[in-house]
Amino acid sequence: MSLNLEQKKAVVAEVSEQVAQAQAIVLAEYRGIEVGDMTKLRAEARKSGVYLRVLKNTLVRRAVDGTQFSGLANDMVGPLVFGISADPVAAAKVLNNFAKANDKFVIKAGALPGKVLDAKGVQSLATLPSREELLAKLLGTMQAPVAQFVRTLNEVPTKFARGLAAVRDQKQAA
């Protein structure tokens, strides 16, 4: 079904809005993928906060033109699914995990702001921890010394209480 001019403008505006907030875009060829598998991919993308759509390449070229992702225009050839995310790693992870499970699904390219990645670059990006994982590790690292200090401070009154209990037990036994 072809789109009329107003519908095309609406799609370009919607994709432009997503691209403006994006930290990563991943392109993948979906030729030969069954509908049920694509539905699972869409559900996984939604859960990870990834905007995932099959769009006409010309419309996406217009949406990314003049942005930090304009270098991707040369890679927009063939039937592609576009994964756009605010987390630099989320789109790469979702699409790469799906590509591992489905041989017909092929990662073509990706981009971070100002940098175009090939398929290997997207795969290596997918192995990085997500922003939430990195923040959790940082928080754990920051809390560890404080928690150890609190345990050390708590040990002094605990030892004193144990000493008093031992003296009390000795006096009661005698």
Swiss-Prot record:
Keywords: Ribonucleoprotein, Ribosomal protein, RNA-binding, rRNA-binding
UniProt cross-references to InterPro entries, sorted A to Z: Ribosomal_uL10, Ribosomal_uL10-like_sf, Ribosomal_uL10_bac, Ribosomal_uL10_bac_type
Entry's Gene Ontology BP terms: translation
GO cellular component, one term: ribonucleoprotein complex
Cross-referenced Gene3D superfamilies: 3.30.70.1730, 6.10.250.290
One Gene Ontology molecular-function label: large ribosomal subunit rRNA binding
One family name in Pfam for this protein: Ribosomal_L10
Similarity field: Belongs to the universal ribosomal protein uL10 family.
Name recorded for this polypeptide: Large ribosomal subunit protein uL10
